[in-house]
Amino acid sequence: MAQPLVKKDDDHDDELEYSPFMGIEKGAVLQEARVFNDPQVDPRRCSQVITKLLYLLNQGESFTKVEATEVFFSVTKLFQSKDTGLRRMVYLIIKELSPSSDEVIIVTSSLMKDMNSKIDMYRANAIRVLCRIIDGTLLTQIERYLKQAIVDKNPVVSSAALVSGLHLLKTNPEIVKRWSNEVQEGIQSRSALVQFHALALLHQIRQNDRLAVSKLVGSLTRGSVRSPLAQCLLIRYTSQVIRDMANHGQSGERPFYEFLESCLRHKAEMVILEAARAITELDGVTSRELTPAITVLQLFLSSPRPVLRFAAVRTLNKVAMTHPMAVTNCNIDMESLISDQNRSIATLAITTLLKTGNESSVERLMKQITNFMSDIADEFKIVVVDAIRSLCVKFPLKYRSLMTFLSNILREEGGFEYKRAIVDSIVTIIRDIPDAKESGLLHLCEFIEDCEFTYLSTQILHFLGIEGPNTSDPSKYIRYIYNRVHLENATVRAAAVSTLAKFGFMVESLKPRITVLLKRCIYDSDDEVRDRATLYLSVLGGDGTVDTDKESKDFLFGSLEVPLVNMETSLKNYEPSEEAFDINSVPKEVKSQPLAEKKAQGKKPTGLGAPPAAPASGFDGYERLLSSIPEFAAFGKLFKSSLPVELTEAETEYAVNVVKHIFDSHVVFQYNCTNTIPEQLLERVNVIVDASEAEEFSEVTSKALNSLPYDSPGQAFVVFEKPAGVPAVGKFSNTLTFVVKEVDPSTGEAEDDGVEDEYQLEDLEVVAGDYMVKVGVSNFRNAWESMDEEDERVDEYGLGQRESLGEAVKAVMDLLGMQTCEGTETIPLNARSHTCLLSGVYIGNVKVLVRAQFGMDSSKDIAMKLTVRAEDVSVAEAIHEIVASG
C-alpha cells in the first residue's frame, strides 16, 4: 500500500500528502502484472499496474529480456478489452517496452486494426506506437496508411502521423522524404497544430538544401501561415535563412527583414515576442533595425501578465550586452519592475539597468538592489554580481560604492559559485582600478577570516602574495595571513606559508618578522606545511643559506619550464624507485587540443579561475604555452595570436596549420602538425622557412618536434625577429622535414632505422592586420570625442572599380583587421555611399578609431575618405600608410 509522505508547510503543519508510488518494488509489480492474464479483464486494476510499470521504467529501472517479454505478451492480451482508458495505457506501455523485431510482429496486426478503426483516438495512438516500434521493412508496408493519415480530416490523426514522421526521419529518412506532397498539404490545414507539425517536418526534410529552405520560407512569408505556433517556427527558419545568406557573402538590405518586422504587429503575443527576439539576435543588427523590436518589448514591460514581462525584460537584457544605448528608452519602465513580485523579473530588470544606466544613477540602483538581494536564489545573485563587475569597469569613479556593496554581500550566506563570483568581481576591480587595490585587498582579508571554502581561501592567499607586497603598507596583511596558519586546514595553511614567503622576499623590512613566523611553521602537524616553511626559510636566508635575488625571485614567482599538464602526467606515470624523478624527462611540447574541444564554447574569464588542465586554443592558452617555453620567455608580453591558417589540403598524409603569435619585436610561427598515417612514426619534425620575400624578418631560432606518432598532434616553432613596434609584412615559404619510421601494426613498435623526407606546405603571409586586435567600443561617438582631435589624420583614397560598395568595405576591414562598430558592416541595398566605424588596439597597446566614408559613382569607381584617431599620432599615420600601400 502507498505510505503517507509527510510534507512540512509553514502554514499547514498538519497536512499530509500521499504518493501513490511510495515503496514500489519491481518484483512485486511484476507479480501484479499477472492480472493481465485473467479471463475477465479488470480495466481499472490493469491500468493501475501499467501505471506502476511506466513509473519504474521512467525511473530508470531495467527489465531483463525475459521480464520485458513476459510483460509484453501479457499486455497484448488487453487488446481484447473495449475500455478506452485501458487501451490508451496499453499504447503507452508498448512504446516504453520497445519490443524486439520478432515480438513486434505479434502486436502489429492489432495496431494495424486500430489504425484503420473508426475511433479517431485509436487511429492516432496506433500510428504513434507503430512508428516507434517498427523497422524499415514494416514501415514500407504501412507507408500508404501513413500518407493517408497525414491528409486526414481529423487534426488529431493528422498530427499523430506528422509527429511520427519527425521521429522516423532520424532512422528512415529516404522513406519520409517521399511524403513531401502530403506534408505540403498539411501546411495548408486549418488546424493550428497540424500546420505547426507539418511545417516542422517539411523543414526537417529540406534542412540540408539551403536553396529549398529559402524557397520554403519565401513562399510561406507571403501570409499562408495562420497558426501562431507555425508562425513562430517560420520566424526561426527565416532568421536562419538571413544568417546563411550573410555567411555566404550577400551584402545590402537583409532579405525577409520586412517579414520579421510585420510579425511585430501580429495579434498573437507569442509571435510578437518571437519576432522581436529574432530581430535582436540578427548578426550585426543596426539601431534602425532594432527600434521597432525595442518599442514592442517596451510595451510588454507594462503588461499585467508576468510571463510577458519576463520574456520582454529577458530579451532586453540580452540586447543591452551589445547595444546598451538602444535600450535606454526602456529604463523608466524597467525601474518600475525592480519591485516586481516575481524576483526573476526584478533581477533581470536590475541587471539590464546596470548595463544601460549612466553614472549618476549608480547610487540609486545600488540602494534598490540591496533591498531584494536576500530574496533571490544564488543563480540570480550571480547574474547581479556579474553586472556590477561590468558596471564598475564602465564607471571606475564609482568603485567605492560598488566595492562596499560587494563586500557586504560577501559576508552574507551563500553557496560556493555565488561567493566565487563576488571574489572574482573584487579581484577584477582591483586589477582594473589601481585606487581600489588596498580597500579591495582588505575586504578579501576579512572574508578569509571566516571562509568555509578551501578553494577560495587558497586563491585569495595566492592573490594577496602577488598584490599585497606592492601596497603602501604591506605589513597590515600579515596578521590575516598568519591567522590562517593557526585556524585552517592543511591546504590553506600551506598556501598561507607560501604567501608569507612572498611578502618576506618582496618587502625587505618585513623579512625578519616573516622569518620568525616561518620558523614557527616548521613544527606544523602537516608535512606539506613543514616542507614549505623549511624551503622558504632556506630561500630567504633564515638558516644562513642565502640565494641570489634572481634565483629567489625565479623560485617564488617564476613559472616551470614545462607545461603543468605534462608535469602532472609524468608524475602520475612515475613509479617509485631508487632513481629520483627527473624533471628534465618531462616533455616540453603540449599536444594540440582535439577539434571538438576547440569548437566548444568557453565561459567568460573570471578573476580567480583555476588554471585549466591544458592550454586553451584562445589567447590565454597560447600565452601560457609560449611562456612555458624557455626560448620564448624573453620576448615580452604576447600581443596577438591569429586564427589557425591551414597549410595543407584536407585528407592529405600530414595535416599542418599555423598560428602567428605577434610580439613587439618577434613573430613566432606555431606549426600544429598531425600524422594521419597509422603505419608511420615521424621523428625530428621541423619546418624550414624561407623568408626571402620577407626582407624585414630574420630567423632567430626554431624548435623541432621530437616525435609525431599517428593521430597525436604536436607543435613545432619557428621564431623571426623584426624591427620593434613596426608592422613588418612578408611572405614565407614552408617545408616540413622529418624522419619516417615504419610501424609494425601488430605490435605498434617502430623500426630503428628511418628515412629522411620532406613535405611542401602552402605559403604563409604576415599582413598588416596581424598587428591589430579587434576591440569594440559600446559608444563610438563618446570614444571618438574622448580622443584628442590633434591626433587625428585624414586622407582620401581611390579604391578603383568594384562590383559593389560592400566589396570595398570588406576589403578595407580585412586590410586593417579592426572591429566594426554599431552594425556599420551592414550596407543598405543599392547604396551609393556608406560610413563604416572601426575600432581596435594597435601593436604597442595603442587604441585606434577609424571613420571610413565610402562613395561610388555611376561607373562603380569607389572613393574613400579615411579619418583616423589614435592615442599616438604616429599610429594614426601608420594606419594611413597601411591603406596607401594596401
Curated annotation (Swiss-Prot):
Oligomeric complex that consists of at least the alpha, beta, beta', gamma, delta, epsilon and zeta subunits. It comes from Arabidopsis thaliana. Its main location: cytoplasm. GO terms for biological process: intracellular protein transport; vesicle-mediated transport. SUPFAM superfamilies: ARM repeat, Clathrin adaptor appendage domain, Subdomain of clathrin and coatomer appendage domain. Keywords: Cytoplasm, Cytoplasmic vesicle, ER-Golgi transport, Golgi apparatus, Membrane, Protein transport, Repeat, Transport. GO terms for molecular function: structural molecule activity. InterPro entries: ARM-like, ARM-type_fold, Clathrin/coatomer_adapt-like_N, Clathrin_app_Ig-like_sf, Coatomer/calthrin_app_sub_C, Coatomer_g_Cpla, Coatomer_gsu, Coatomer_gsu_app_Ig-like_dom. The keyword Acyltransferase does not apply. Belongs to the COPG family. This is Coatomer subunit gamma. Residues 592-613 are annotated as: Disordered. HEAT repeats lie at residues 66-103, 288-325, 327-359, 360-397, 472-509. GO terms for cellular component: chloroplast; COPI vesicle coat; Golgi membrane; plasma membrane; plasmodesma. It is a peripheral membrane protein. The coatomer is a cytosolic protein complex that binds to dilysine motifs and reversibly associates with Golgi non-clathrin-coated vesicles, which further mediate biosynthetic protein transport from the ER, via the Golgi up to the trans Golgi network. Coatomer complex is required for budding from Golgi membranes, and is essential for the retrograde Golgi-to-ER transport of dilysine-tagged proteins. The keyword Transport applies. It comes from the Eukaryota. It is found in: Cytoplasm; Golgi apparatus membrane; Cytoplasmic vesicle, COPI-coated vesicle membrane.
